[in-house]
Amino acid sequence: MRNPEERMDPWREALECYKSITSDIVIVGQDLEQEFKWDDLGKMFQEGFDKSEGDWVINLSIDMLLHETDIDKLIKLIKLYPDEPAIALPKYKFFEPERYQIKSFETVILNKKKYKNILFNGGGDLALPTLENVVLNQSTVKHLDVPVWNYDTTFRTKEIIAQD
């Protein structure tokens, strides 16, 4: 988390959401420089994965939430796929309260119990998870019908967005 208060990220809401899923919450990114660099993203995700202690790692940024009514469904569905290395969820990206798009499927759930060697070094920004040098993206992993809600710029002022 890099200056979530200043950036007007919904960090309190996100942490409450994560607490409803697990007690193993890993926060990374506090030491990042103010100026964002894309190559920091994969390193930060890897640090979070490495520090996580659970069988499954749910890799969500501080502006991404799961709806409280979907938590039980998600946990039940994950248990159906113990041999999958990763699972993708549809990402609904909000720009404003009434303006959003279904952006893509995000590979955010990773099976650390069976696949400890997952690395975040894939894709153009070197932040996508890989297994044996194969990117674990929407074309290679299982999809679940439980959306991730991304509130990217929803609560930010135009000035904050311009700085970011």
Spans of features found by a protein language model:
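Catalytic-site signature of metal-activated, phosphate-bearing donor transferases
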Residues: 39-46, 65-164
